[in-house]
Amino acid sequence: MRPMFILIAGAGRVGSAVASRALEAGHEVSVIDSDPLSNERLDKDQLTTWEDAGGTFTVGAALELDALLAAGIERADVFLAATRGDNTNLVIAQIAQRRFNVARVVVRVADPGRAAWYAEQGLNTISPTQSAIDQATSAALSA
């Protein structure tokens, strides 16, 4: 598999974990987050700093085109929207998909109903809430 350029919006638990795994797998990874201290979460998963390990970090709001451009969205093979807000994730995922023609766009959506609708619109949605519902139901109803 050829190395991909992966852009991740949001350096929280999900975004930073995916970023670290992708970097370890040999991909080029760029993370954008509005909190300048959020790169500390990226650093803690590395033996060195995130940047020394080969990752890039951009401070900026992913809803701002200039910040997305600075983070490298124009050359992204994959875009992951993993900020705290469903609305933000859905908007930036559509920007990545429609304006920048990113080949693979993955968006985290807490609301299962919205996740299903956006999946029908062509976005690759992940709903942690739906996953928890499915697992809890399975555990509760299994004999």
Where are these regions (language model features)?
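Cytosolic regulatory regions of ion transport systems
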Residues: 1-143
